[in-house]
Amino acid sequence: MAFKATIFKADCQIIDMDRHYHHDHSLTLARHPSETDERMMLRLLAFAHHASDTLTFTRGLSSSDEPDLWQKDLTGTIERWIELGQPEEKRIRKACGRAQQVIIYCYSGNSARIWWEQTGAGLANIKNLTVLNIPSENSKALAQLAQRNMQLQATIQDGDIWIADNETSVEVTPETWQLQQ
């Protein structure tokens, strides 16, 4: 018997002081049966960090040809490709060839650092790639905010991201491992 995705709803007020972006988004996230709350909330964090009217969640773990989020223009050109985890170098290179900007959000603490030590040198010359690491204490704290129906506020200022519900606020400071040139 196949397990179905669990649907989560998030009403998210996003205030990005760095980009002067203020908007409310009603989001629907389908959590794949193998996806953890931590990973799902990191998808939500990535959305908040790059929010726009054209940024969308994809089939994610259910598809090998799509990232976790992407932003396309009206012609279907991929402007932004956002991936979570530790993708293979071949997949990253393919994404960089298809999209104007590729952003990788690493997490999982020490395993992410080991992945970057093994993969980073091979990616150093890719000009449209940004690699960010989310410290494990931040991603685990974000996971605690996961509920089937969420009312969240996201504030971004000076590269720091605060995600809050009515009771708890989590500050996330992404570590920049590689920045788009």
Regions found by a protein language model. Give the residues of each.
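Short polybasic amphipathic segments
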Residues: A10-C12, L69, D160-A164
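Terminal alpha-helical anchor/extension segments at protein ends
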Residues: L44-H50, S63-E66, W70-K72, K90-R91, ...
